[in-house]
Design a protein with these regions (language model features):
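Secretory-pathway lumenal glyco-enzymes, predominantly type II signal-anchor Golgi glycosyltransferases
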Residues: 2-328
Length: 328
């Protein structure tokens, strides 16, 4: 009888131990599960923080060619050196079919300056400029947050701080429209010959009103609209003409023609009122920057090469743009 009682107590002890061990294992598993979940949440939070887009007041896209190292160096040393932290610039370059040596040079430049937007699926050429702009818009919408975009060429000189002041003034007036700002042309005849010929243009005898390509500003939502509809847009040889066409049917836009944008295919001269002046060589870029830094004026002597115009939005585009003396 004693042995049976002893055996029964022993079995009970074993059962209690099994229950205790099982309970401990369950507790450990619950704690481990909670810790794992916390780690995942922490990791997700860290990843989300890393993926958060940097916000800029102004994002500057500068179209440049792979071999235009001198132009990029000049811009970094001149007007880009004056930009504030809320301004981001990117040199846009297509890298498809580049020779290995060119790739290595660009990679070295990227490591040093971290300001290249490289497009691996774009062959960099005059005939692909519109694709270049379109692919750039898609990339920056994915990777950056910004209020306004300035698109310029690598031979354009820009007074960034004056652009920013003008943007602040425009917003302070309470406008609720999207901004398309530049030097507009509404009566440019369709090119049928040469590098910029448009064999596919069949909309009308003239290009639709557009801001010429030496420099123009778009508000964020317009860039996003183009990027989101990229697969459905018609592409023409001239990127500035294409942008004007893409935005032609969009409502709630202020098309702001500004004679302070010297952004046509050749410069109109030099004026201390200019915000952007196009077709500048590296040497003239340095001279403009040095003189502006020393005096606060862009020109040592103001002059005009050709007449300008105020855009008349009340008449048909073919009558919009009458050049007159006395306009910068």
């Amino acid at each position: 009888m004693y042995n049976l009682t002893r055996l029964s107590n022993k079995k009970l002890t074993i059962r209690i131990n099994i229950v205790t061990v099982t309970f401990i294992i369950v507790i450990i598993m619950v704690i481990y599960s909670l810790l794992l979940k916390q780690c995942r949440l922490s990791s997700d939070s860290s990843n989300n923080s890393q993926l958060k887009k940097q916000k800029y007041r102004l994002l500057i896209l500068i179209l440049t060619a792979p071999d235009n190292m001198k132009e990029r160096v000049t811009l970094r040393k001149t007007w880009l050196s004056d930009k504030s932290d809320n301004v981001k610039h990117l040199f846009v370059i297509g890298t498809e079919n580049l020779q290995l040596e060119n790739h290595e040079t660009l990679q070295s430049e990227q490591l040093k300056f971290k300001d290249l937007l490289l497009l691996p699926k774009l062959r960099d050429a005059y005939g692909t400029l519109t694709k270049k702009v379109l692919q750039s818009f898609k990339r920056i919408i994915d990777e950056y947050d910004f209020d306004y975009l300035l698109k310029v060429d690598d031979d354009s000189f820009v007074l960034i701080h004056k652009l920013l002041v003008n943007l602040d003034t425009w917003e302070a007036k309470g406008y609720r429209k999207e901004l398309y700002w530049g030097f507009f042309n509404g009566k440019a005849q369709v090119k049928r010959h040469g590098a910029w010929k448009e064999s596919e243009w069949n909309l009308c005898d003239y290009y639709l009103p557009y801001a010429v390509g030496g420099g123009y500003v778009l508000s964020y939502n317009l860039v996003k609209y183009i990027a989101m509809n990229a697969d459905n847009l018609r592409l023409f040889n001239s990127e500035d003409v294409s942008v004007g066409l893409w935005l032609s049917a969009v409502a709630n836009i202020e098309r702001r023609h500004d004679i302070r944008f010297d952004t046509e295919y050749r410069s109109r001269g030099c004026s201390n009122d200019y915000l952007i002046t196009h077709k500048q060589s590296p040497d003239s870029m340095k001279a403009l920057h040095d003189y502006y830094t020393a005096t606060g004026n862009l020109c040592s002597k103001e002059f005009s090469n050709r007449m300008s115009y105020h855009y008349n939005w009340t008449v048909p585009p073919s009558q919009c743009c009458v050049r007159k003396p006395g306009i910068i």
